[in-house]
Amino acid sequence: DNAIRKVSAEPIVAGAEVEVIDGRGKFLMPGLIDAHWHAYLAANTMVDLLTAHASYTQLRAGEEAGKTLLRGFTTIRDAGGPVFGLKRAIDEGTLPGPRIYPSGAIISETGGHADFRMVYDIPEPFDCCGLTHTEKIGAAIIADGVDAVIVASRNNLRLGASQIKLM
């Protein structure tokens, strides 16, 4: 299960279940933790995040997760974005990647840092359908006022967020 069971300067008796790696002249370190990572921003351009099909950006994020693991990061805190499916795929062993602590959709007020609406998007009260592309894929949520932020936070927690990202 890719776990180091014992490190010793003394000889270890190798049995059928033991693999001994000669580490002389090498370094051993624990897995790194990245406390501010975005699977989607690391893997995709902003244009793709705003316009590409969700399946394309999902695949790119999965590839980036594998690369992140190979760079030595065994745990990451995703600071916002649609990673619940990616987390599940990694947890189940479908894809290689680090342990993910997800935030879910970034919560922002109208005109805030995570208001990724295009200039031609109609504000929600006047729009028949309500959700923008980034809201539909779970990248960001526009929440104006305390009640809306509470609802958005609860929705992220319901999906499995371990923390909430407000911008």
Spans of model-derived segments:
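Metal-associated gating/positioning segment near the N- to mid-region
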Residues: K26-E92, T110-M118
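Short beta-strand and adjacent tight-turn residues that come in two discontinuous sequence segments
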Residues: S8-A9, D78, L166
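Histidine-rich, glycine-flanked metal-binding segment
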Residues: D1-M29
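A short, hydrophobic secondary-structure junction motif
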Residues: R5, A61, A65-T68, A148-V149, ...
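Short acidic/polar active-site loop segments enriched in Thr and Asp
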Residues: R5, T74-T75, S162
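Metal-coordinating catalytic core of metallo-dependent amide/deamination hydrolases
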Residues: T94-M167
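Fold-independent oxyanion-binding glycine-rich loops
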Residues: G23-R24, A79, S103-A105
